[in-house]
Design a protein with these regions (language model features):
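Conserved, single-site charged/polar hotspot
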Residues: 1-150
Length: 150
């Protein structure tokens, strides 16, 4: 689902973060080990079953060889993967492939998918874009105000 607060609703736009090493990532994990963490046998596939308007998965379906399924949030999956030693940066999985007991996941992104992209903001600043414009790109509709002083 999308956020009802306009400045936090996410943006579907090109970003200079595409040059970052975390823009696209690949990780491998034992299908059996992952299955054990989520109450399945050997996990053979992971597919998005629910997405927000910007195609970022909000629910992922894990399926084992017997056809049993478990739905999890991207955050839960990232936590399960991290517990197994994976370096997956986000739950935004673009592709999963199972071969000889190993589940290979290809994904995108690093953060939570809402608000300011740190890598993109840094790249824009290096290109001379001012902080006000960077904030406006990241948080459309937000107003900058001073809330301290005399």
């Amino acid at each position: 689902t999308s956020n009802a607060v306009a400045p936090l609703s996410g943006q579907g736009r090109p970003c200079p973060c595409q040059k970052s090493g975390r823009y696209r990532w690949t990780t491998k994990v034992s299908g059996k080990s992952l299955g054990g963490r989520v109450g399945l046998q050997t996990v053979r596939s992971i597919k998005p079953v629910q997405s927000n308007p910007w195609a970022r998965a909000t629910k992922l379906r894990l399926q084992d060889a017997q056809g049993s399924v478990v739905d999890v949030s991207p955050e839960k999956l990232r936590n399960h993967l991290a517990a197994l030693g994976s370096k997956a940066f986000s739950g935004w999985i673009l592709k999963s492939q199972y071969q000889q007991g190993v589940l290979t996941l290809e994904g995108a992104g690093f953060g939570h998918g809402v608000g300011m992209c740190q890598y993109g903001s840094e790249a824009r600043a290096r290109d001379g874009v001012g902080w006000r414009e960077i904030l406006a790109l990241s948080y459309p509709g937000a107003k900058i105000a001073t809330n301290w002083g005399p």
